[in-house]
Amino acid sequence: VWIERYLSVSYPLHRMKINSLYGYRKDPFTGKKKFHNGIDLHARGDEVMAMMAGVVVKVGQDKSSGKYVTLRHGDYTVSYCHLSRILTRKGAAIGPRDVVGITGSTGRSTGEHLHISCKLDGKSVDPLMVLDYIKSIREECVAALAESREAPALSPAGGKHR
């Protein structure tokens, strides 16, 4: 059960380094204070993985997001933006760790990175909530597995196995 739960989530990149947080910040193009609707992760030609099981609801390209993929995970949608390549298609069923694209610097971008934006019931939310959820599941599972290895095995009669 714990291994299945651990495998039910994934970080979007093999190495995680946050360059820019969700919320108001100085716009790198204008220098003015502007709302940043996601987080930016450091990346260099990295595979972008789905964080949970879901369905690809949109793939496309625009001036702002560049090449992007949007996945639906229940009430959440997660968009991965500024990709150099899209490696999935609309309607595809996706599992955690499935590669959906390669990081890049397409669209309104100052350099290569992965921009992740999340919506809950259509409203923008901080993607760190999803990353914190993934971290908590992984920590819970690792702790439970470690505890199960430390517990002495009991025989049906209640004694320890030898």
Question: Which residues make up each language-model segment?
Answer:
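Catalytic cores of peptidoglycan-degrading enzymes
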Residues: 11-150, 154, 161-162
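Long amphipathic alpha-helical scaffold segments
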Residues: 1-14
